[in-house]
Every structure is written in C-alpha cells, then in structure tokens.
Amino acid sequence: MSMAYEEYMRQVVLPMRQELTDAGFKELTTAEAVEDYIADAEGTTLVFINSVCGCAAGLARPAAIYSLQHDHTPDHLVTVFAGQDKEATAAMRSKFPDYPPSSPSMALLKGTEVVHFIPREDIEGAEPEAIVRNLALAYNEHCQK
C-alpha cells in the first residue's frame, strides 16, 4: 500500500475518530494500548469497534454517543478502529472470543468480562432509538453505581 494512500485514509477517517473522542472515548490505536487497558480494566467499559461504513456513521456512533445521556453509564469509554488500527482491533476482538468479528459493534465489559454485545447485524437497519434503548437496558443492568 502506498504511503500516499495511507495518509489519505488517515485524513478521511479523522472526523469518524473525532466524533467518538469528542464524546469522551479514549482511542486505543495499538495492540499494546489494548493489552495495557485490559490489564488494568476495572468497573464497566463500553468498547466501540469503529468503522467507515454507513451504519457506523448514521446509526452506531450517534446511538453510542446519545446513550451516554442515560442515568446509568459505563465508567470508561474506549474505541478501536477496524480497518485502520488493525493490530489494536485484533487485540480487542481477541477479548471477545464468543463473538464473531463485527464492525461496527459495541461491547459492554464488566472488568474484562463481556456482559453485553451489539454486533453489526443488530445495528444495520435498526432505528438509532432502538440501539440507544438496547444500550440503556444494558447500562441499567450493569452500570449502576
């Protein structure tokens, strides 16, 4: 792959990254960053597997961000970007062995255990409000302080 293409793609996805980081998500861009985060994971974490696809832009990212207005929310927010930060994404997906790779997707962790997972097939074609409700129900069950 040419360096010009890689730089172009970095620029194209920048707003897609910023949408989440502006909402408080911490980007994990290397496998080492993922491993370090998981090693110290406490409380609840919403993991967002980001993507360039339309359902990420029109459904998943807005729903994840809006869900943070709920009364109960995760203690931590992290994101990896599928197709861009490949090693980080592979490292994070390795923490969800019971779920096939899917992007966009969201996992709610309690410590290092996946307690709720929303795969792409539950995002595509869904109304954003339905995704927010899905997350809110998981937050109610797992994120009460």
UniProtKB/Swiss-Prot annotation:
It comes from the Bacteria. InterPro entries: BrxB/BrxA. GO terms for biological process: cell redox homeostasis. Belongs to the bacilliredoxin family. This is Bacilliredoxin ABC2045. It comes from Shouchella clausii (strain KSM-K16).
